[in-house]
Design a protein with these regions (language model features):
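Residues at secondary-structure transition points
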Residues: 16, 33, 60, 85, ...
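Short, flexible loop segments at the rims of nucleotide/cofactor-binding pockets, characterized by
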Residues: 8-10, 55, 80-87
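Short, well-structured N-terminal submotif of metal-dependent ribonuclease cores
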Residues: 1-34
Length: 134
């Protein structure tokens, strides 16, 4: 699983830190789980002026980013609230889904990464894209 910032790094910014995730996804070693709420958040963020400017430079519209999301992410049902709570309410949906599926969660959000130990106790690895190994 990847949060919205990592989605942007993967699909728009082509950040080299996401390369291992991209390769694992392409080779079907992993599956990218997401929800409609996560897709909706991405769509909203793509409307931010700074992101729109980056899309213009990359000659990529929001529709193209969303199309890539739709072809790579598997939409699943929203997860119930996990037993751990993130300081940032916007990140809770990622925590909940990762806990339900005992998944690796890639993020660069401090509010998520500071939960590493608590999440590991629930069989969830929270880490940066740079640290990802399939």
């Amino acid at each position: 699983m990847i949060d919205t910032n990592i989605v942007l790094d993967l699909l728009l910014f082509k950040d080299p830190a996401t390369q291992a995730f991209k390769q694992a996804l392409a080779s079907a070693k992993i599956q990218w789980l997401s929800t409609q709420a996560m897709r909706d958040e991405l769509e909203r963020v793509l409307g931010y002026p700074k992101i729109m400017a980056r899309m213009a430079v990359a000659e990529m519209g929001a529709d193209k980013v969303l199309q890539q999301f739709d072809t790579q992410a598997l939409l699943v049902d929203v997860a119930p609230k996990a037993s751990v709570t993130c300081r940032d309410p916007d990140d809770q949906k990622f925590i909940d889904l990762a806990v339900l599926h005992k998944a690796t969660l890639l993020s660069k959000d401090r509010a998520v990464l500071c939960m590493k130990k608590r999440l590991l106790a629930l069989s969830v690895r929270a880490q940066t894209a740079m640290d990802f190994e399939p």
